Protein backbone atom coordinates (compact mmCIF):
# COMPACT_ATOMS: atom_id res chain seq x y z
CA UNK A 1 0.00 0.00 0.00
CA UNK A 2 1.37 3.40 -0.97
CA UNK A 3 1.83 5.90 1.86
CA UNK A 4 1.07 9.56 1.22
CA UNK A 5 2.00 12.56 3.37
CA UNK A 6 -0.40 15.51 3.20
CA UNK A 7 0.97 18.92 4.27
CA UNK A 8 -2.05 21.23 4.49
CA UNK A 9 -2.79 23.85 7.15
CA UNK A 10 -6.56 23.80 6.55
CA UNK A 11 -7.68 20.99 8.86
CA UNK A 12 -10.95 20.28 7.05
CA UNK A 13 -9.26 20.08 3.65
CA UNK A 14 -6.46 17.91 5.07
CA UNK A 15 -9.04 15.53 6.54
CA UNK A 16 -10.97 15.46 3.25
CA UNK A 17 -7.81 14.55 1.32
CA UNK A 18 -6.98 11.85 3.89
CA UNK A 19 -10.50 10.41 3.66
CA UNK A 20 -10.56 10.36 -0.15
CA UNK A 21 -7.09 8.84 -0.43
CA UNK A 22 -7.82 6.20 2.22
CA UNK A 23 -11.08 5.33 0.45
CA UNK A 24 -9.02 4.81 -2.72
CA UNK A 25 -6.62 2.36 -1.09
CA UNK A 26 -3.80 4.64 0.06
CA UNK A 27 -2.42 5.14 3.55
CA UNK A 28 -2.61 8.89 4.21
CA UNK A 29 -1.00 10.88 7.01
CA UNK A 30 -1.68 14.58 7.53
CA UNK A 31 0.46 17.38 8.96
CA UNK A 32 -0.29 21.10 9.18
CA UNK A 33 2.90 22.72 7.85
CA UNK A 34 6.20 22.18 6.07
CA UNK A 35 8.24 21.80 9.27
CA UNK A 36 6.00 18.96 10.41
CA UNK A 37 6.27 17.40 6.95
CA UNK A 38 10.09 17.39 7.12
CA UNK A 39 9.94 15.90 10.62
CA UNK A 40 7.53 13.21 9.40
CA UNK A 41 9.89 12.42 6.51
CA UNK A 42 12.71 11.90 9.03
CA UNK A 43 10.74 9.33 11.02
CA UNK A 44 8.80 7.43 8.36
CA UNK A 45 8.87 6.48 4.68
CA UNK A 46 6.37 8.04 2.27
CA UNK A 47 5.79 7.38 -1.42
CA UNK A 48 4.36 10.81 -2.27
CA UNK A 49 3.71 14.22 -0.74
CA UNK A 50 0.70 16.44 -1.34
CA UNK A 51 1.55 19.96 -0.19
CA UNK A 52 -0.18 23.29 0.07
CA UNK A 53 2.02 26.30 -0.65
CA UNK A 54 0.78 28.87 1.85
CA UNK A 55 1.44 27.28 5.24
CA UNK A 56 2.85 28.65 8.50
CA UNK A 57 6.44 28.01 9.60
CA UNK A 58 7.66 26.51 6.30
CA UNK A 59 5.75 26.99 3.06
CA UNK A 60 5.35 24.44 0.29
CA UNK A 61 8.05 25.98 -1.90
CA UNK A 62 10.62 25.73 0.89
CA UNK A 63 9.48 22.22 1.79
CA UNK A 64 10.11 20.98 -1.75
CA UNK A 65 13.42 22.88 -2.03
CA UNK A 66 14.61 21.31 1.23
CA UNK A 67 13.73 17.83 -0.01
CA UNK A 68 15.43 18.31 -3.37
CA UNK A 69 18.56 19.85 -1.82
CA UNK A 70 18.78 16.76 0.41
CA UNK A 71 18.62 14.55 -2.70
CA UNK A 72 15.10 13.28 -2.03
CA UNK A 73 13.24 12.53 -5.27
CA UNK A 74 9.84 11.77 -3.70
CA UNK A 75 7.01 12.87 -6.02
CA UNK A 76 5.32 16.08 -4.85
CA UNK A 77 1.88 17.30 -5.87
CA UNK A 78 1.27 20.93 -4.91
CA UNK A 79 -2.35 21.87 -4.27
CA UNK A 80 -2.89 25.58 -3.68
CA UNK A 81 -5.16 28.57 -4.10
CA UNK A 82 -2.34 30.35 -5.95
CA UNK A 83 -3.52 30.31 -9.55
CA UNK A 84 -1.14 32.80 -11.21
CA UNK A 85 1.25 31.41 -13.80
CA UNK A 86 4.28 32.74 -11.85
CA UNK A 87 3.16 30.79 -8.78
CA UNK A 88 2.82 27.62 -10.84
CA UNK A 89 6.21 28.21 -12.45
CA UNK A 90 7.79 28.73 -9.02
CA UNK A 91 6.19 25.50 -7.82
CA UNK A 92 7.80 23.53 -10.63
CA UNK A 93 11.13 25.38 -10.36
CA UNK A 94 11.15 24.58 -6.63
CA UNK A 95 10.95 20.90 -7.50
CA UNK A 96 7.29 19.87 -7.45
CA UNK A 97 6.15 17.26 -9.95
CA UNK A 98 2.56 18.41 -10.42
CA UNK A 99 0.37 21.38 -9.49
CA UNK A 100 -3.35 21.74 -8.88
CA UNK A 101 -5.37 24.86 -8.05
CA UNK A 102 -8.05 24.92 -5.36
CA UNK A 103 -10.90 24.21 -5.29
CA UNK A 104 -9.74 20.71 -6.11
CA UNK A 105 -11.73 18.02 -7.86
CA UNK A 106 -10.80 15.10 -5.59
CA UNK A 107 -11.35 12.57 -8.37
CA UNK A 108 -8.77 14.40 -10.49
CA UNK A 109 -6.45 14.53 -7.47
CA UNK A 110 -6.66 10.74 -7.10
CA UNK A 111 -5.89 10.29 -10.80
CA UNK A 112 -2.86 12.58 -10.55
CA UNK A 113 -1.63 10.79 -7.42
CA UNK A 114 -1.95 7.46 -9.22
CA UNK A 115 -0.04 8.76 -12.25
CA UNK A 116 2.75 10.25 -10.12
CA UNK A 117 3.14 7.02 -8.17
CA UNK A 118 3.16 4.94 -11.36
CA UNK A 119 5.92 7.11 -12.88
CA UNK A 120 7.95 7.00 -9.67
CA UNK A 121 7.61 3.22 -9.48
CA UNK A 122 8.73 2.86 -13.11
CA UNK A 123 11.74 5.12 -12.50
CA UNK A 124 12.67 3.10 -9.41
CA UNK A 125 12.43 -0.15 -11.37
CA UNK A 126 14.69 1.29 -14.10
CA UNK A 127 17.25 2.35 -11.48
CA UNK A 128 17.22 -1.17 -10.02
CA UNK A 129 17.70 -2.76 -13.44
CA UNK A 130 20.50 -0.36 -14.35
CA UNK A 131 22.14 -0.81 -10.94
CA UNK A 132 21.96 -4.59 -11.28
CA UNK A 133 23.41 -4.44 -14.78
CA UNK A 134 26.31 -2.25 -13.67
CA UNK A 135 27.00 -4.55 -10.72
CA UNK A 136 26.95 -7.58 -13.02
CA UNK A 137 29.43 -5.84 -15.37
CA UNK A 138 31.81 -5.15 -12.46
CA UNK A 139 31.60 -8.76 -11.30
CA UNK A 140 32.30 -10.04 -14.83
CA UNK A 141 35.21 -7.63 -15.17
CA UNK A 142 36.62 -8.70 -11.82
CA UNK A 143 36.46 -12.37 -12.86
CA UNK A 144 38.10 -11.80 -16.24
CA UNK A 145 40.67 -9.22 -15.17
CA UNK A 146 41.44 -9.52 -11.44
CA UNK A 147 43.11 -6.48 -9.99
CA UNK A 148 45.70 -6.64 -7.24
CA UNK A 149 46.51 -3.80 -4.87
CA UNK A 150 50.17 -4.85 -4.64
Tell me what each language-model feature is.
Residues 15-23:
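Charged docking surfaces used in two-component/phosphorelay signaling
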Residues 55:
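Receiver (REC) domain active-site loop signature in two-component systems and cognate sites
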Residues 52, 80:
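Active-site residues of response regulator receiver
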Residues 33, 59-62:
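Acidic catalytic/metal-coordinating carboxylates
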Residues 25-32, 40:
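Short hydrophobic/Thr-rich beta-strand motif most characteristic of the beta2 strand and flanking loop
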Residues 3, 115-150:
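Short, Lys/Arg-enriched segments at the junction into DNA-binding effector domains
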Amino acid sequence: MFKILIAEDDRELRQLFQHVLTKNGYAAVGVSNGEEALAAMDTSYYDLIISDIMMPKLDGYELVRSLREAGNSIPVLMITAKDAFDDMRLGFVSGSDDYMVKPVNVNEMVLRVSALLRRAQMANERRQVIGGTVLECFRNLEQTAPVSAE
